[in-house]
């Protein structure tokens, strides 16, 4: 394990380029969440629902926004003050105190299999049993994990990190600084079949590619299929969680986020800055505009043309769901009122019948 690092509060503030308030000589040697932090930890407050911990936390320093520092300044604690987004400064602290642990296999391992026509850039790491197929290209300072396969004619840009047991099929194009977690499969053939007169299914050859642009992250056991004729594309900066299925000829826009176990059917186009909640299912051949948020387990059956928050199955605006839920919650009282009305109607009917019989 790496040696423990210790910074004074002032040194930490200088590294983060933030203001400091309190004892500048306080030693800081680690990071922790606000409810568990001890005197040697730096922590942060981003979500105000955790503000109940700030009074009693034993943290050596707390990262706050300027507005929060004014609000909690009377507590006489050590603060690191940022203009906004304390969580970003805290992430930098994590990177300072907890450096990444590499596999211990520097350079190109002797068991790695490299085709003679493949091109390997400078300072590339190839872990044990990595396979680089014909005419594949690996950019400078990229890292290919143990047992991963880079298919024929595929290209990876600079500073990519492909974790162990990843399969990147043939003719896949991956940009710079892309991270692919273990078990992901990129470029498999899409789920496309034709059924003949005898009811037998024949798989259709998929000729398209998968294009992954710069700064994309792909989670563990996620699958991105190639298109039948056109390419499947993941645009710049998009982050994809674990166990996500992206079908053939899907296009996902820039800086979107797709949460675990979501599935996007073929030929669907997702806009920029879209958030797709966990276990959401999106049908094929539709489009989702920019700045749409889909709650968990949303079922999207048709195109969405207006930004906003959507949920339910079929998907509908969040406000509409709230109104429907409120009405559903009122059903027991409505049933009770209907029962009372039925009894009154029965009573009135009986009185009417008696009045008709009485001479």
Curated annotation (Swiss-Prot):
Query: Biological process (GO) annotations?
Result: lipid A biosynthetic process
Q: Which reaction does it catalyse?
A: a UDP-3-O-[(3R)-3-hydroxyacyl]-alpha-D-glucosamine + a (3R)-hydroxyacyl-[ACP] = a UDP-2-N,3-O-bis[(3R)-3-hydroxyacyl]-alpha-D-glucosamine + holo-[ACP] + H(+)
Print the keywords alphabetically.
Acyltransferase, Lipid A biosynthesis, Lipid biosynthesis, Lipid metabolism, Repeat, Transferase
Q: Name one GO cellular component term.
A: membrane
SUPFAM superfamilies, per the entry: Trimeric LpxA-like enzymes
Please indicate if the UniProt record lists Acyltransferase as a keyword: yes
Q: Record's InterPro entries?
A: Hexapep, LpxD, Trimer_LpxA-like_sf, UDP_GlcNAc_AcTrfase_non-rep
Task: Classify the source by domain of life.
Answer: Bacteria
Q: CDD domains from the xrefs?
A: LbH_LpxD
EC number(s) per UniProt? Answer: 2.3.1.191
The kind of enzyme this is, by top-level EC class, is transferase
Pathway recorded for this protein = Bacterial outer membrane biogenesis; LPS lipid A biosynthesis
Q: Which family does it belong to?
A: Belongs to the transferase hexapeptide repeat family. LpxD subfamily.
What does this gene product do? Catalyzes the N-acylation of UDP-3-O-acylglucosamine using 3-hydroxyacyl-ACP as the acyl donor. Is involved in the biosynthesis of lipid A, a phosphorylated glycolipid that anchors the lipopolysaccharide to the outer membrane of the cell.
This protein's assembly is summarised as: Homotrimer.
Which PANTHER family does the entry link to?
UDP-3-O-ACYLGLUCOSAMINE N-ACYLTRANSFERASE, UDP-3-O-ACYLGLUCOSAMINE N-ACYLTRANSFERASE 1, MITOCHONDRIAL-RELATED
What is this protein called in UniProt? UDP-3-O-acylglucosamine N-acyltransferase
From what organism does this protein derive?
Answer: Chlamydia felis (strain Fe/C-56)
Identify the coding gene: lpxD
């Amino acid at each position: 394990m790496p040696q423990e690092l210790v910074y004074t509060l002032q040194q930490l503030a200088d590294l983060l380029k933030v203001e400091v308030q309190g004892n500048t000589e306080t030693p800081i040697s680690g990071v922790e969440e606000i409810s568990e932090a001890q005197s040697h930890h730096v922590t942060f407050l981003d979500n105000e629902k955790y503000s109940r911990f700030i009074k009693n936390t034993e943290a050596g320093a707390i990262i706050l926004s300027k507005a929060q520092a004014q609000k909690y300044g009377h507590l006489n604690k050590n603060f690191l003050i940022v203009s906004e987004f304390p969580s970003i400064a805290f992430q930098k602290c994590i990177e300072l105190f907890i450096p990444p642990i590499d596999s211990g296999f520097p350079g190109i391992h002797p068991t790695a299999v490299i085709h003679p026509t493949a091109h390997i850039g400078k300072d590339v790491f190839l872990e044990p049993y990595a396979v680089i197929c014909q005419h594949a290209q690996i950019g400078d300072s990229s890292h290919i994990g143990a047992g991963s396969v880079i298919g024929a004619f595929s290209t990876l840009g600079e500073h990519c990190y492909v974790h162990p047991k990843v399969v990147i099929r043939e003719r896949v194009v991956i940009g710079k600084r892309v991270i692919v977690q273990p078990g992901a499969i990129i470029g498999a053939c899409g789920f496309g079949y034709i059924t003949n007169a005898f009811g037998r299914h024949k798989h259709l050859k998929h000729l398209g590619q998968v294009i992954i642009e710069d700064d994309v992250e792909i989670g563990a056991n996620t699958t991105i299929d190639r298109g039948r004729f056109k390419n499947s594309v993941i645009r710049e900066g998009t982050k994809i969680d674990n166990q996500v299925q992206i079908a053939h000829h899907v296009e996902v826009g820039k800086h979107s986020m797709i949460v675990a176990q979501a599935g996007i059917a073929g030929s669907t186009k997702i806009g920029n800055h879209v958030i797709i909640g966990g276990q959401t299912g999106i049908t094929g051949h539709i489009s989702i505009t920019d700045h749409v948020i889909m709650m968990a387990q949303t079922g999207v059956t048709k195109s969405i043309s207006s930004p906003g928050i959507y949920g339910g199955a079929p998907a509908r605006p969040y406000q509409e769901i709230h109104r429907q839920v409120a009405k559903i919650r009122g059903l027991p009282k409505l049933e009770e009122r209907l029962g009372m009305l039925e009894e009154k109607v029965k009573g009135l009917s009986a009185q009417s019948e008696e009045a008709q019989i009485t001479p």
